[in-house]
């Protein structure tokens, strides 16, 4: 089973909110997941981005072999910079 850390879109039209999830790579993006690591809310109006991410859980899943997507790598870097 290939495990990935990816973003699953939530929220309303023109107001995206993303859930950072750990899931099997063969499942749909919004389908069943193994764990929720946090949320990411990019602000379309230019305000600060809101990132709530459990970095300890992220490191734990990466050590177990989960592969983060490119966008999730960017979100992790933003969360570590805070």
Swiss-Prot record:
<dbReference type="GO" id="GO:0003735">
    <property type="term" value="F:structural constituent of ribosome"/>
</dbReference>
<dbReference type="InterPro" id="IPR000307">
    <property type="entry name" value="Ribosomal_bS16"/>
</dbReference>
<comment type="similarity">
    <text>Belongs to the bacterial ribosomal protein bS16 family.</text>
</comment>
<dbReference type="InterPro" id="IPR023803">
    <property type="entry name" value="Ribosomal_bS16_dom_sf"/>
</dbReference>
<dbReference type="InterPro" id="IPR020592">
    <property type="entry name" value="Ribosomal_bS16_CS"/>
</dbReference>
<dbReference type="Pfam" id="PF00886">
    <property type="entry name" value="Ribosomal_S16"/>
</dbReference>
<keyword id="KW-0687">Ribonucleoprotein</keyword>
<keyword id="KW-0689">Ribosomal protein</keyword>
<dbReference type="GO" id="GO:0006412">
    <property type="term" value="P:translation"/>
</dbReference>
<dbReference type="GO" id="GO:0015935">
    <property type="term" value="C:small ribosomal subunit"/>
</dbReference>
<protein>
    <recommendedName>
        <fullName>Small ribosomal subunit protein bS16</fullName>
    </recommendedName>
</protein>
<dbReference type="GO" id="GO:0005737">
    <property type="term" value="C:cytoplasm"/>
</dbReference>
């Amino acid at each position: 089973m290939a495990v990935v850390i990816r973003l699953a879109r939530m929220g309303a039209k023109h107001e995206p909110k993303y859930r950072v999830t750990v899931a099997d790579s063969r499942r749909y993006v919004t389908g069943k997941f193994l764990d929720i690591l946090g949320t990411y809310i990019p602000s379309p109006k230019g305000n600060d981005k809101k990132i709530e991410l459990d970095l300890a859980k992220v490191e734990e899943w990466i050590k177990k072999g989960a592969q983060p997507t490119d966008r999730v790598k960017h979100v992790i870097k933003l969360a570590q910079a805070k």
